[in-house]
Every structure is written in structure tokens, then in C-alpha cells.
Amino acid sequence: MAATHLHIPPNPKTQTSHQNPPFWFSSKTGIYTSKFPSLHLPVDPNLDAVSALFSHKHHGDTALIDSLTGFSISHTELQIMVQSMAAGIYHVLGVRQGDVVSLVLPNSVYFPMIFLSLISLGAIVTTMNPSSSLGEIKKQVSECSVGLAFTSTENVEKLSSLGVSVISVSESYDFDSIRIENPKFYSIMKESFGFVPKPLIKQDDVAAIMYSSGTTGASKGVLLTHRNLIASMELFVRFEASQYEYPGSSNVYLAALPLCHIYGLSLFVMGLLSLGSTIVVMKRFDASDVVNVIERFKITHFPVVPPMLMALTKKAKGVCGEVFKSLKQVSSGAAPLSRKFIEDFLQTLPHVDLIQGYGMTESTAVGTRGFNSEKLSRYSSVGLLAPNMQAKVVDWSSGSFLPPGNRGELWIQGPGVMKGYLNNPKATQMSIVEDSWLRTGDIAYFDEDGYLFIVDRIKEIIKYKGFQIAPADLEAVLVSHPLIIDAAVTAAPNEECGEIPVAFVVRRQETTLSEEDVISYVASQVAPYRKVRKVVMVNSIPKSPTGKILRKELKRILTNSVSSRL
């Protein structure tokens, strides 16, 4: 049973009360170590991620279900299909080890099959969101030297215009109709081609090129190896499942996250299949459809990003509680949840365990994971370091390593950390420093129990008269106002002060909340130097699909509003 109270984080300006450093922190090296025992990862240098996945034994039956049609395949059938499709891709399409193949696909039961088939051949997969523009697709195709793409009907023309060979992936699961309407895809999937030479794939070989979000700069191709994918499967997905009394094979997961993103891919294309779990795949997230799918398929686990959690909470308020009876856990990642949204969820679905986690594309989604118990809950935290992971909190001004309770840039190290950025040694050298430490760019701190809290991005820090202000701190104050639905804060240049905090506020309809009211409210809650100096009322806060605030868009709105008055 999930508790309904929130843990209040320690004052980040004060150090932990421990007289001696806790066992998981070294004051000499500044290294935080996972509180969990290290796990033994496969040592065979010639082990590929697909072989590692299917080497795990379990008692699971159904592997994948299409949420719309109910079409399903078992775990046994999945392994056979992956081998069969790999043979078709090898013989019909001529794909060989080292070839780069793009998946520009929406969520479907076919997605994991195609991905696993390709990397089992030693091919390198780069994924793209199917809603990508022609310019975005062109950039990635060019940078990755893509020669072949699997895509849905609406993107065939875009990819063909770029000189890429295209395989149109059917949206149907009626194989008789597929054989007539899409014979090439049917041939790859269903015909028998016999022997395929097994390539020598090393754990250090690149398996995937996943693109970072690019919310704070140009998107970059992240090189992930078979070793990285195995680490994600073992340290993120399988380890988390091992912490609960019920077996992973009894869980039914709802896959509404994009499978083309590292969060969805690590869970639904790799890790959960090794546990024998059942995955119900939705083409795209829709709150109304989610309610029906949870009830129909008795979903037990639902990984989400913040916008999905907010939509689910809102929809759940108008639905009979019995609909969500099967739901055990909702896990959120990609962006921190505000306290207001956490409280709202816990009040609406008190029987559901809510956890947050932390990971990056650059760490193959391995980082931290939340754990709640009857005695201890840290809903605002992103959890404890995963096994085999280490961290440092670094003062971004002096470079010194900081103890628990102090804010600094989070560095992480472990087997999930990427090989580097594609064709960008300068960016790689700036991000991976001092013997494989990944600089995350996130401001964070560990509390006295080893739980990690993400505060903000270093690039977003507002510098007011020499003081440093984290926008997320002010955003937390703003959304605590009963008449404010959502808020975001960014910096505006100021000759006298350097920068000043500007708040973008979404207020409740039919309220008379004024800019002055907002400024006064924040001023009553924070130190004088942290006050909001300007307020802009907006209808919505611009955010990425994963819920990250698009601060570049806020600055654009701010610039346009200033220009319009000149």
C-alpha cells in the first residue's frame, strides 16, 4: 500500500547530520556507491544483447499484445519470429554486420521483433519518432549513413526521397491480407530462408544509435553498445523486478511510451521480455483509451512520463475505482514530477505505488530507481543508485566533490554509459571525463539516506547579482498556489542585475489572479534575491513529449513580447 504523505527533502544548503560519512559515500574520493550489492554481468566478450535476452529462463506465456485488436504472440513464438525475420532480412534485404538501419515506426508488436532481428545480425539500429519532419529525418539519415529503413505508410515517401531503401511495415496482424497487400514484409517475416551465418558480435560493438532529446542544444547521436543494452536489461529492468515479492512473469505492462525512445526501448523491447512479462502495446497514448486498456487487459504496471501521469490522474477522477483495481505501480521518468502532481496522484489512486527513476539516453536509461515501503517513501526523489553504478556531485564553480545534502552537477559512472557521440569527439570529450565519468548536466543532491533528488539543469541556472537561482525551485513555489495550474521560469537579461527570473503562469479559468499577485506570493515564500521579477500569463507551458519544459521556446516568447512593444 502506498503511503499518502510526502517526504520533505533536507535543506540543500546544510550537510547531512552523519558524524561519520555513510558507507555509500567516500569523503576521500567524493564517490557515491550504490547501496545495493554489485551484480555479476556477463563476461563473455562475444555475447550479443539478443542472445543475452533469450538466455534468461522464465515461466512467462504471452509476450506482446496489440491493445486495439488483441493480437498476441507468446515468448516462444517471439524468439522463433526474431530468428525467422533475421533470416529474411539477411537473405532478402542483404543486411550485414555493421549496416545502419533506421526504424521510423510507431509503437507496434512488430517493433521489438524488427529491432531484435536486426541487432542479432550485427546491424546497427537508429530509431526516429514517426512524427519527425523531413528535415529531421534527413539529418539523422545523413549523419548515420542509413541505407535501409523500416517505416509506416505515411513516411515511405519521405524516406524514399532521400535515396533510402524502404520497407513498409504493415499495421495489420492479419497475415493473409499482409501476404497480398505487403508481400515483401510478409516474405521477410514469414517465409523460411534457412541458414544464416552467425556473425561474431562483441559486447563492445555498437548496437544502436539513439538520439538525445536536444532540448538544450542540437540533438546528437548516442552510440550504445551490446554491453550497454545488456547492462540496461540487468541493472535497470531485471534488478528492479527482483525487489518485489511477485515474479516478473506475472506482471502485465502497458507500453504507451514511444518505443523509439531509450526509456520505452529499454523496458519494452529488451528488459521486460527477458523476465517473461506481458507487454500490451498501444500505438500512441490516449488517456481515454488507457482507461479501457487497463481494465480490459488487467494492467499491473504502467511506466509513464509526467504529461501521461497528469492525464491519467485527471481521467481517473471521473472513473469508478474498480477500473484501476489491477494497477499496482506507476513509474515516471524523463523529467521530475512536481510535488503538486505527486499529491494529486496519491489522493486519486492511493492504492497504486508511485515511483520515479532517473536515467539518460547516454546511460542507456541506467541510473536510479525509486523504492517505497511501509516505513519509508521518497515520492519526490528519483530513487537510489542502481547496482554497479557510482556517482559524484561536483561543485560547478570550484570542481570540488560534495557530500550528501549539497547541490552540484551529477556525474555518473557504470556499464550503461555510452561509447560516445556519433562523429563528435569534442562533445564526447566534454561529456565523458576523468576515467569514464558521464557529466549529466543535471543539478542534484543525495539526501541522508542515499536518495537522489534532481533539482534542475546547469544551463538553466539564473544568475542574479552573483546569486544562482534554480528555476525548478521557483516553479515548485508557483504551482503550490491554489489558482496556478502550471508554471515555468526562465531568465531574462538585465543590465543592472545580469539576469532576472521571469515566470510563465497558467492560471485557473475564471480567476482574477494578477501578475502582481503572483510576484507577491513568491516573494512571501523565498529569499529576496530569489523573487520573481516579471510574470507572463499564458494558456499553456511549452513542453517536449516527455514533459521537459522547452525553455528555449519560453525565451522566444519573451523576446517576441519585448519586440512587439518596441
Curated annotation (Swiss-Prot):
The lineage of its organism: Eukaryota, Viridiplantae, Streptophyta, Embryophyta, Tracheophyta. One of its GO terms (molecular function) is (E)-caffeate-CoA ligase activity. Its EC number is 6.2.1.-, 6.2.1.12, 6.2.1.27. CoA binds at R284, K465, G466. Belongs to the ATP-dependent AMP-binding enzyme family. Residues 357-421 are annotated as: SBD2. A motif (Microbody targeting signal) lies at residues 564-566. GO terms for biological process: ubiquinone biosynthetic process. Keywords: ATP-binding, Ligase, Magnesium, Nucleotide-binding, Peroxisome, Ubiquinone biosynthesis. This is 4-coumarate--CoA ligase-like 6.
